[in-house]
Regions:
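Envelope-exposed proteins and targeting segments
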Residues: 47-50, 74-75, 88, 99, ...
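Conserved functional hotspot residues or short segments at active or partner-binding sites
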Residues: 115-153
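Flexible, low-complexity junctional segments that flank or bridge functional domains
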Residues: 2-4, 153
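Gly/Ser/Thr-rich loop/hinge elements
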Residues: 4-61, 88-94, 109
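Stable alpha-helical elements in mature extracytoplasmic
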Residues: 7-14, 62-66, 75, 140-151
């Protein structure tokens, strides 16, 4: 949660760490030739141990790829709130004046084929945040406490 994203390549790598096989994500550009599919190859490094991914509206882009891939493969329980719903791959084009222009170059799709653009990844278990700010290991972190109790049960 509260992860605004990052590189597509890193989302694929971290997802691959927890999946035995199958598609992680696909990207589709304007032309059919711009379609790319990314698959898990390494195998589940933690051998099927339970995973809970906590999400909220601050979870976007690469973190949505990770949460969505693990959810679609039934490899993790997604707990918390709906994610942001970015759903696009962007590139920075350098400008002569030293600035840059961010350009959407493709949309990404979860293994189910679903686009999360503007809708996000829906949690399996809805637990709304009740704290102001983000404090890991806080006694008032109801989402974290819910996840810990779920893992203990």
């Amino acid at each position: 949660r509260n992860n605004p994203g990052g590189l597509l390549s890193q989302a694929v790598k971290i997802s691959d760490f927890f999946l035995n096989d199958g598609e992680i994500v696909s990207t589709k550009g304007r032309k059919i030739s711009e379609t790319r599919r990314f698959f898990a190859r390494k195998g589940d490094a933690i051998n099927g141990k339970p995973i809970i991914v906590i999400t909220n509206s601050g979870s976007a882009s690469a973190s949505e790829i990770f949460a969505g891939a693990l959810k679609d493969h039934k490899r993790a329980i997604i707990l918390g709130e709906n994610t942001y719903g970015k759903g696009s791959v962007q590139s920075i084009i350098p400008l002569k004046n030293g600035g840059g222009m961010r350009l959407t170059i493709s949309k990404y799709y979860l293994p189910s084929g679903k686009s999360i653009s503007e809708v996000g990844v829906t949690p399996d278990i809805l637990v709304e945040e009740k704290v102001d700010g983000f404090k890991i290991n806080s006694e008032t972190d109801n989402q974290l406490n819910y996840a810990i109790n779920l893992l203990k049960s």
